[in-house]
Swiss-Prot record:
The gene is EST2. One of its GO terms (biological process) is telomere maintenance via telomerase. Telomerase is a ribonucleoprotein enzyme essential for the replication of chromosome termini in most eukaryotes. It elongates telomeres. It is a reverse transcriptase that adds simple sequence repeats to chromosome ends by copying a template sequence within the RNA component of the enzyme. Catalytic subunit of the telomerase holoenzyme complex composed minimally of EST2 and the telomerase RNA template component. Mg(2+) binds at D530, D670, D671. Residues 422-725 form the Reverse transcriptase domain. Gene3D superfamilies: 1.10.132.70. Its main location: nucleus. This is Telomerase reverse transcriptase. It comes from the Eukaryota. The keyword Oxidoreductase does not apply. Belongs to the reverse transcriptase family. Telomerase subfamily. The keyword Metal-binding applies. GO terms for molecular function: metal ion binding; telomerase activity; telomerase RNA binding; telomeric DNA binding. It comes from Saccharomyces cerevisiae (strain ATCC 204508 / S288c) (Baker's yeast).
Length: 884
């Protein structure tokens, strides 16, 4: 990367000392801005150079830029920042006329006087080459902005979405769909309420084996536009499918279910609701038995193939929420020639026949794991995560319905009323209401459940497109505006937006106390509580009052899409920024994405009113609207709750600290934490919480209110939003049990390590390895918890991959990288080599202990870790002797 001044001289071989054009412009100095762009802009070549457009010789400066934009657009190079906001208008009068639906600031800048002079200085060819084949980044004294080139200097290629849309073949899309990763979404959260049968197993497969049903089933498994089946093979496949349907008709599903996964005896009161789940191992056994009795032996092909399919079935049932299995892993180690029902044995096995067999096998395995197995699972089990976790649990439908029926009856009676004026629940455009489907999630507390409203997205593709447009142009901008209004409002307490900020806020409070009390913490009083059924209890009219108050000093909103590239982590994130309120940090590269939405104050009010007053829950053939409160799951519910509970903290004087006292109040959603030197204030807040916050219709969960003192018990640790807080020393850490195991599914070891580094960075972003907050022992304990989590993710990611020399070298580089990240985040290590040694040892030893559970698999990694620890011990031995 070179500054433009050097780029002109080195790349273009222009001697600025003797160039007459430059000298003439230089006389004007800063008045024309040329000198500024030469010294503040940097050029970086694209790794994939492309041909330049052919331009007429008489074009103006602005016309040259427009032609470059058209050239990029026609080549579908939409990642180039010059194309952002532009489209090509095509009609019978105009062939290639640029249309700009949002102002592109970069193009406006390039069309200015300074860049026009630069154009005249270097010539049109060099100027166009710079626009097409380079990235230009400008520094404004505070941060960097990309003004030319592909986003983050990506190679010249159409973006993936353009490649997908340019493929006119529906067949190509269907083939791609066949080989996409397999997820558990097909069988999650499938309610079976008020059905004539708890287990409608007749719908798993057609109940008849007529020619039409056989043909329909065959074409569902082997789409005719994807694979050609010779007539003789059709007969063979039909015979196998006929056996399948006959077995289905004779199979006593419920008897097998009761034998393997029997309903638990006793009433709901006798057992906790979570203890009534069917163990995953039993569910697996049930599905295996069903498949063995349902599928003819030839469909498996062989015992080896059956074993592989069963192994993958176990992986499917073990997937966490949002987990997936790469499709090629389902095919791995399957012997295609064992699927004899998919080819004619007396036909010579040519390359073409093998390719056809391969395609048939892909279709069959895809159908098995995307259709048949999910249908079997969802027919007999309600599959769901437990609230705030990602592990999937399984309940028999009859057991689940018994558990939730009392809750649903009470919920509908208390909060909902039937919507008698709605007659079109399925349509997004023809109904005056926003319909949502009901999802029920069990909580950890006994017999407690959470209802989530999942927005319906329309009855067909056309309505889905309209839904997406409204979500992009109205809902998402309004969500960001609500967050902007919340952030802008001055409050007496410090607002936090994520659990990653908890430790930082407590550190600031702790440092303030230590400074005030001569490096000794005073006695502190803690209280935490959460609001009972917070979404259901939110008063909607109060919501609108708070919103309208927040809008009084506003004059509309511009919501602009902007990219921010973190140069430290290599992560590129897209943000919707309201009224230019986000300023790039010094380590960020700013890339304007141009797309802008403008909403007036009344627009915001209209969108919010539609969301909170006209969202309906669609259950079977009826829909229900709320009497009050909000549906959890709506895009706007969470920011509305934040606005309301911020107002609650400002309204009640009990939350205001006395002038001579120090109080920290943290609120995240409906969870509240108070830490204060003022015992009376905590007593007053507890009394208020016990009685309820009447103005806001909010009641605290009385059995979850916790109040402790730092002097009452030396070992008291409280949890707040999955963070552990040691009350005596005001130290904070995150336990490994609160960290989800991130499932990385990739065949690329390089990609796996890249994901692990990003995950490690997320884990230490909670800022709990700061010695201004925590003691050295707590810092080391936190590092150990993080390493436990990362090492488990590592073992899971390489479960089916071999550990070779290349991987071991990558593992070594990975260790060095996370050690560097940890040392960088723990400044005391720079002052004390012994602490740095302990940090390094904690990381290395943590991996060693974890990988030692499978010494045969990770033998090379273990040898490497032991050598690294020995080198570290030798180094510290020498250091101690030198110091002494």
């Amino acid at each position: 990367m070179k500054i433009l001044f050097e780029f002109i001289q080195d790349k273009l071989d222009i001697d600025l000392q003797t160039n007459s054009t430059y000298k003439e412009n230089l006389k004007c100095g800063h008045f024309n801005g040329l000198d500024e762009i030469l010294t503040t802009c940097f050029a970086l070549p694209n790794s994939r150079k492309i041909a330049l457009p052919c331009l007429p010789g008489d074009l103006s400066h602005k016309a040259v830029i427009d032609h470059c934009i058209i050239y990029l657009l026609t080549g579908e190079l939409y990642n180039n920042v010059l194309t952002f906001g532009y489209k090509i208008a095509r009609n019978e009068d105009v062939n290639n006329s640029l249309f700009c639906h949002s102002a592109n600031v970069n193009v406006t800048l390039l069309k200015g006087a300074a860049w026009k002079m630069f154009h005249s200085l270097v010539g049109t060819y060099a100027f166009v080459d710079l626009l097409i084949n380079y990235t230009v980044i400008q520094f404004n004294g505070q941060f960097f902005t990309q003004i030319v080139g592909n986003r983050c200097n990506e190679p010249h290629l159409p973006p993936k979405w353009a490649q997908r849309s340019s493929s006119s073949s529906a067949t190509a899309a269907q083939i791609k769909q066949l080989t996409e990763p397999v997820t558990n979404k097909q069988f999650l959260h499938k309610l079976n309420i008020n059905s004539s049968s708890f287990f409608p197993y007749s719908k798993i497969l057609p109940s008849s084996s007529s020619i039409k049903k056989l043909t329909d089933l065959r074409e569902a498994i082997f789409p005719t536009n994807l694979v050609k089946i010779p007539q003789r093979l059709k007969v063979r496949i039909n015979l196998t499918l006929q056996k399948l349907l006959k077995r289905h008709k004779r199979l006593n599903y419920v008897s097998i279910l009761n034998s393997i996964c029997p309903p638990l005896e006793g009433t709901v009161l006798d057992l906790s609701h979570l203890s009534r789940q069917s163990p995953k191992e039993r569910v697996l056994k049930f599905i295996i038995v069903i498949l063995q009795k349902l599928l003819p032996q030839e469909m498996f092909g062989s015992k080896k193939n059956k074993g592989k399919i069963i192994k993958n079935l176990n992986l499917l049932l073990s997937l966490p929420l949002n987990g997936y299995l790469p499709f090629d892993s389902l095919l791995k180690k399957l012997r295609l020639k064992d699927f004899r029902w998919l080819f004619i044995s007396d036909i010579w096995f040519t390359k073409h026949n093998f390719e056809n067999l391969n395609q048939l096998a892909i279709c069959f395995i895809s159908w098995l794991f995307r259709q048949l197995i999910p249908k079997i699972i969802q027919t007999f089990f309600y599959c769901t995560e437990i609230s705030s976790t990602v592990t999937i649990v399984y309940f028999r439908h009859d057991t689940w319905n018994k558990l939730i029926t009392p809750f649903i009856v009470e919920y509908f009676k208390t909060y909902l009323v039937e919507n008698n004026v709605c007659r079109n629940h399925n349509s997004y455009t023809l109904s005056n209401f926003n319909h949502s489907k009901m999802r029920i999630i069990p909580k950890k507390s006994n017999n407690e459940f959470r209802i989530i409203a999942i927005p319906c997205r329309g009855a067909d593709e056309e309505e889905f497109t309209i839904y997406k447009e409204n979500h992009k142009n109205a809902i998402q901008p309004t969500q960001k505006i609500l967050e902007y209004l919340r952030n802008k409002r001055p409050t007496s307490f410090t607002k936090i937006y994520s659990p990653t900020q908890i430790a930082d806020r407590i550190k600031e409070f702790k440092q303030r106390l230590l400074k005030k009390f001569n490096n000794v913490l005073p006695e502190l009083y803690f209280m935490k509580f959460d609001v009972k059924s917070c979404y259901d209890s939110i008063p909607r009219m109060e919501c609108m009052r708070i919103l309208k108050d927040a809008l009084k000093n506003e004059n509309g909103f511009f919501v602009r899409s902007q990219y921010f590239f973190n140069t430290n982590t290599g992560v590129l994130k897209l943000f919707n920024v309201v009224n230019a309120s986000r300023v790039p940090k010094p380590y960020e590269l700013y890339i304007d994405n141009v797309r802008t939405v403008h909403l007036s104050n009344q627009d915001v009010i209209n969108v919010v009113e539609m969301e909170i007053f006209k969202t309906a829950l669609w259950v079977e053939d009826k829909c229900y609207i709320r009497e009050d409160g909000l549906f959890q799951g709506s895009s706007l519910s969470a920011p509305i709750v934040d606005l309301v509970y911020d107002d609650l903290l400002e309204f009640y004087s009990e939350f205001k600290a006395s002038p001579s006292q120090d109080t920290l109040i943290l609120k995240l959603a409906d969870d509240f934490l108070i830490i204060s030197t003022d015992q009376q204030q905590v007593i007053n807040i507890k009394k208020l919480a016990m009685g309820g916050f009447q103005k806001y219709n909010a009641k605290a969960n009385r059995d979850k209110i916790l109040a402790v003192s730092s002097q009452s018990d030396d070992d008291t640790v409280i949890q707040f939003c999955a963070m552990h807080i040691f009350v005596k020393e005001l130290e904070v850490w995150k336990h490994s049990s609160t960290m989800n195991n991130f499932h990385i599914r990739s065949k690329s070891s390089k990609g796996i390590f890249r994901s692990l580094i990003a995950l490690f960075n997320t884990r230490i972003s909670y800022k709990t390895i700061d010695t201004n907050l925590n003691s050295t022992n707590t810092v080391l304990m936190q590092i150990d918890h993080v390493v436990k989590n990362i090492s488990e993710c590592y073992k899971s990611a390489f479960k089916d991959l071999s550990i070779n020399v290349t991987q071991n070298m990558q593992f070594h580089s990975f260790l060095q990288r996370i050690i560097e990240m940890t040392v960088s985040g723990c400044p005391i290590t720079k002052c004390d080599p012994l602490i740095e040694y302990e940090v390094r040892f904690t990381i290395l030893n943590g991996f060693l202990e974890s990988l030692s559970s499978n010494t045969s698999k990770f033998k090379d990694n273990i040898i490497l870790l032991r050598k690294e620890i020995q080198h570290l011990q030798a180094y510290i031995y020498i250091y101690i002797h030198i110091v002494n």
